[in-house]
Amino acid sequence: MFGTGRERMLWIAGALVLLAIMVVFLSAPAWTRHPNIPPQPAMSGMEGMDDMPDMPGMHMEVAAPAPTPEVLAKQLADKRESEFNHHLAGALMILAALFFLAQDRLSSRWPSARYAWAACLLFAGVFLLVFSDTEIWPFGYQSFLYAVTHNPEDAQHKTFAAILVALGVVATLRTSGRLRGWWSAWIFPVLALAGATMLLFHHHGGMHGPDAMQTMVRVQHQHLRFAGAGAGVAVAKGLADTSGKWQPFFNKLWPLFMIALGVMLLMYTE
């Protein structure tokens, strides 16, 4: 199944990298499995306000305590981390699409170039698997299992990363001819559509400040656009791999959807 000795070594190396990542995640110290996460600060002196009857014509608006410099610095770092991850993923999506569109020309000189677009997906998936959500051990104070079972956003990010890795693996196997069954043509589209559907329900926390609500709405709208482009990739890729007459057209169309998705990811802001 894995072809030549060189191909076999590459697959073994990739499997060992993923295994090493999971070993590091799952070997977190005991204290990270039940981290002491401080609750949100209470509003001093306002105890019992919930029990007071409503007063006609009076709207109670209690200002939250001002965040400390440390909290502000952490919020800014999280924002930059999230935006960087989106931008990197976008750049790799664009690069993957361009490699696919140019693969015939490139592979005539460098045969291995036909795997370049799949390698971009693999790299994006592995990077996000490791570096998204740095509150997870070994970068932070939460174990992998605690984070993905207590924070829906973390669980979704790791799922997106796993989907990218799976897309890269499937693309590599089909490009090499190791995966030939008729059903294998649907793996990539189904995975891509699953990722696009998840974006419709993506939980995104950590919004702060007076414009938090507007920021959340803007982020949700961006996710909707990501989902639309991702669905376009899925449908066009499925048709490219299964339709004979229209295959050349859809083989050009689905990378264009991927480029559109990549551009939107590059423009992502919080």
Regions of interest found by a model, annotated:
Residues 1-33:
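Hydrophobic secretory-pathway targeting helix
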Residues 14, 114-127, 182-198, 251-263:
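Transmembrane alpha-helical segments of multi-pass membrane proteins
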Residues 34-83, 134-153, 204-221, 270:
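Membrane-interface interhelical loops and short amphipathic "cap" helices
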Residues 75, 82-91, 117:
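An N-terminus-focused feature that recognizes amino-terminal "leader" regions
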Residues 89-99, 122, 156-172, 225-239, ...:
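Hydrophobic cores of alpha-helical transmembrane segments in multi-pass inner/ER membrane proteins
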Residues 98-115, 135-141, 171-186, 204-213, ...:
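Juxtamembrane membrane-water interface segments of multi-pass membrane proteins
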Residues 124-172, 200-207:
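Membrane-interface helix-loop-helix modules in multi-pass inner-membrane proteins
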Residues 264-270:
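Juxtamembrane boundary at the C-terminal end of a transmembrane helix
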